[in-house]
């Protein structure tokens, strides 16, 4: 680097014209000198500075990265397909859900089946000798009127109750079967 001296000259704030009516007070001319180190540049263009990497990469990796970054999108897609075939992997194997699962956890834990919490009570069949008792049971279990309860047990199978708990479904099934109807829980 070359070392040079820079000079700054301080002047008075008064106008320097000779036509001024006021007598100008002469200010002493002061000069400050201080050294400045300037870089020796061969040309005035900005130089390319590489960003500092968190990890030093080997030259081979840098060259490979430069070549990959110069690929077109079509060439990059072909490269991905080639590497998937060569390495025997798929894009699905890199899904975030696969990362969350611990290796070997699936083999240790048995498959968990979700227990059903809502059930439907279906009246499958009502014999003719049990119609009146079934209508009474339907009216007792619901707030249906006589006509609506009668229409419910005609044209079977029909859903009697939907989305009820297991206990409520079993209780309704028990009462309807005591009345003589054939009932199933779905």
Curated annotation (Swiss-Prot):
Key word Ribosomal protein present = yes
Report the subcellular localization.
Plastid, Chloroplast
Q: Name one GO biological process term.
A: translation
Q: Which UniProt keywords apply?
A: Chloroplast, Plastid, Ribonucleoprotein, Ribosomal protein, Transit peptide
The residue span given for the transit peptide is 1-53
GO CC entries: chloroplast; ribonucleoprotein complex; ribosome
According to the UniProt entry, which residue ranges have a biased composition of type Low complexity? Answer: 12-24
Q: Bias category Polar residues: which stretches?
A: 1-11
Q: Where is this region: Disordered?
A: 1-24
Decide whether keyword Ribonucleoprotein is in the record: yes
For this UniProt entry, the molecular function terms from Gene Ontology, in alphabetical order, are: mRNA binding; structural constituent of ribosome
The cross-references to PANTHER family, in alphabetical order and at most eight, read:
39S RIBOSOMAL PROTEIN L12, LARGE RIBOSOMAL SUBUNIT PROTEIN BL12CX-RELATED
Q: By its UniProt entry, which HAMAP family does this protein fall under?
A: Ribosomal_bL12
Instruction: Family membership, please give it.
Output: Belongs to the bacterial ribosomal protein bL12 family.
Q: What is the name of the protein in this document? A: Large ribosomal subunit protein bL12c
What organism is recorded for this protein?
Nicotiana sylvestris
């Amino acid at each position: 680097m070359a070392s040079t001296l820079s000079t700054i000259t301080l002047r008075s704030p008064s106008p320097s014209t000779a036509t001024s009516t006021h007598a100008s007070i002469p200010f002493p001319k002061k000069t400050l000198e201080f050294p400045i180190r300037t870089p020796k540049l061969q040309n005035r263009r900005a130089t390319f500075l590489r960003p500092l990497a968190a990890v030093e990469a080997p030259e081979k990796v840098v060259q490979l990265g430069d070549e990959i970054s110069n690929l077109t999108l079509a060439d990059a897609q072909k490269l991905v397909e080639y590497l998937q075939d060569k390495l025997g992997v798929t894009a699905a194997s890199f899904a975030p859900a696969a990362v969350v699962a611990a290796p070997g956890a699936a083999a240790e834990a048995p498959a968990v089946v979700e227990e059903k919490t809502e059930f439907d009570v279906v009246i499958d069949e009502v014999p003719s000798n049990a119609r009146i008792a079934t209508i009474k049971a339907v009216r007792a279990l619901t707030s249906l009127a006589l006509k609506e309860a009668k229409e419910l047990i005609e044209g079977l199978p029909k859903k009697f109750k939907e989305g009820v708990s297991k206990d409520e479904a079993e209780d309704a099934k028990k009462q309807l079967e005591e009345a003589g109807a054939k009932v199933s829980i779905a």
